[in-house]
Amino acid sequence: MNNDNIAQLIADFPLIEKMVELKEVSWFNPNITSLQEGLPYVGLDNNNIQDASDRLARFAPYMVKAFPETAITNGIIESDVVEISAMKSQLEQQYEVEIQGKLLLKKDSHLPISGSIKARGGIYEVLTHAEQLAIKAEVLELSDDYSKLFTEEFKSFFSQYSIAVGSTGNLGMSIGIMSAKLGFSVSVHMSADARQWKKEKLRAHGVNVVEYNEDYSVAVEQGRQEAENDPKCFFIDDENSQTLFLGYSVAGERLKQQFDAMHIVVDENNPLFVYLPCGVGGGPGGVAFGLKMAFGDNVHCIFAEPTHSPCMLLGILTGLHDGIAVQDIGIDNITAADGLAVGRASGFVGRAMERLLDGFYTISDQRMYDLLGLLNKVEGIQLEPSALAGMLGPIVVTNNDEYLKRINMSNEKLVNATHLIWATGGGMVPAIEMEKYLSKAGS
């Protein structure tokens, strides 16, 4: 993209100038529609989510055997929702603003197996592929007890096949660990941002880790090429996969059940705001789709991105989607939020979800570190930097009168609001790494 194009983009979308200056910005989507209007553009519906949910239920007996830590939830990979009222008080004090309603944290950071939101989509896509291969080979039927997959016989069957994926870290962890457990040969192509401990953990599980000095897009492309050269190799495409997307979407119905158990009502007078950190977009996009299907127009999904990697905001704001990367406008895509270090958003997710997302904001690395330190101090919960991107959301929303007015959000409704921060990772960060993170937090 040449300077003339950039000048034209800035003329058309003045917000881009601030983004290029790495300022924290927010943008609330003027093109949002109702679920009914926006759903046809997704190309998926509740039947697809139900199918994903049923598949995960079929695999539950296997998961209990393969990963005993999932026995407590009967082989279903799910995380807790906790209220963080001390954090809410601290945020109100620091930002001198009153957050109406309650503040909750969704602890995907502490999901079993890989300790991140990617345990949803990544594991689901590996299981889907394994099921398809086994059914095609007539060694498995849908009515079988899937715990039979936890045998040497099946490990040997899956070992003829391989799986490849490109990742900044967390997706590679979930896909690598799951694939290796089933018996697949698996290669994870890791971008320059990937943390060393994640690579070491994967290698300990027998995963082939391929390292690059370039960013996420290069790692994905190399993974794609590996699969193209081998008919028995399956490439998990984080940029375009509907299967990954559906693995995440199951979270919506499950959250609804958790809210029911907690007596939390979501309706027109009791709105739900959900703040989701966004990298390439598959995880937050899939979760947001599931939330919309579960709560309809009463849930407001807002994506949070690092100031250095605002790829989904850039793609949806300009309507160019994956036709533009942050590097095209001079942003470096280098951030401490390694899980969000993506320069070019998923075109599939952007086009599918652009009418169903309320807004976007960007957050600096230092602010993520500061919030990480604060959450640890007042709630005793430790997350990785990218998982804190959503924590600023309630402040951004509360301070945006124009947006609240546009969605007819009266003060009476806001008092009853639930603000949910989706914590995307950090539960498996080694203590020495966590110390480094905490040392970067401001007092």
From Swiss-Prot:
NCBIfam families given in the database record: D_Ser_am_lyase, PRK02991.1
Organism whose genome encodes this protein: Colwellia psychrerythraea (strain 34H / ATCC BAA-681) (Vibrio psychroerythus)
UniProt-listed InterPro entries: D_Ser_am_lyase (IPR011780), Ser/Thr_Dehydratase (IPR050147), Ser/Thr_deHydtase_PyrdxlP-BS (IPR000634), TrpB-like_PALP (IPR001926), TrpB-like_PALP_sf (IPR036052)
GO molecular function, one term: hydro-lyase activity
SUPFAM superfamilies: Tryptophan synthase beta subunit-like PLP-dependent enzymes (SSF53686)
Protein family (similarity comment): Belongs to the serine/threonine dehydratase family. DsdA subfamily.
Cofactor(s), by name: pyridoxal 5'-phosphate
Top-rank lineage group of the source organism: Bacteria
HAMAP family from the UniProt entry: D_Ser_dehydrat
Protein name: Probable D-serine dehydratase
